[in-house]
Structures are given as structure tokens and as C-alpha cells.
Regions:
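Amphipathic alpha-helical hairpins/coiled-coils and adjacent low-complexity
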Residues: 1-102
């Protein structure tokens, strides 16, 4: 790579998008698993105990995965904001150094 062009506004938008996605995914993962299970027990009863046990495990694993995905988006946003702040500071310092010799 010879040249790298950074457009701060694009990175700000990227960070904001990841915040929004992380929030939406996190909200999707806040279902009331206990209420879902209680409702299903009434439907499946004793006959469906094995299915319900498997479903409860699968749902718990799914919700952990959803939480992890939300955390990845939040982390991506935080890393982008931190990198952009560092870039802006370095860019300003470099510009000041150039101006000082002109």
C-alpha cells in the first residue's frame, strides 16, 4: 500500500452504524426466555419434555451468541472511535509541524 486515505466522516458513520446494529441485536436478544419456556410447557406437557430440554439448551446457546454478536459490534464501534481520535490527533500534530516550517 502506497497511499492511505482516511475520511473521518465515513469512519464516524461506520462507528455509528455499528453502535446501532449492536443496540438492535442486543435488544433482539433480550427476550424473556423463562416466559417462552413456561408457555411451551403448557403446550407440550409431559410428552414433550425431551424436546423442551433440548429447546431450552438451544435457546440459551442462541442468546449467548446474540449477546456475543452485540458485543462485537459495540467493540468495533469503540475501536473505530478510538482509532479515529488517534488519527485526528496525529494528523493535527503533523499539520502543525508542517505549518511551523512554512
Amino acid at each position: 500500500m502506497d497511499n492511505v486515505t482516511v475520511t473521518p466522516e465515513v469512519l464516524e458513520g461506520f462507528a455509528a452504524t455499528n453502535v446501532a446494529i449492536g443496540t438492535a441485536v442486543g435488544a433482539a436478544g433480550t427476550i424473556d426466555a423463562a416466559a417462552n419456556t413456561a408457555a411451551m410447557i403448557g403446550v407440550f406437557g409431559l410428552i414433550g419434555q425431551e424436546f423442551l430440554a433440548a429447546f431450552i439448551t438451544a435457546q440459551a446457546n442462541h442468546l449467548v451468541g446474540v449477546g456475543s454478536l452485540a458485543a462485537v459490534h459495540a467493540s468495533t464501534a469503540a475501536s473505530t472511535v478510538a482509532a479515529l481520535a488517534e488519527f485526528d490527533a496525529n494528523d493535527a500534530a503533523s499539520a502543525a509541524a508542517i505549518r511551523s516550517v512554512l
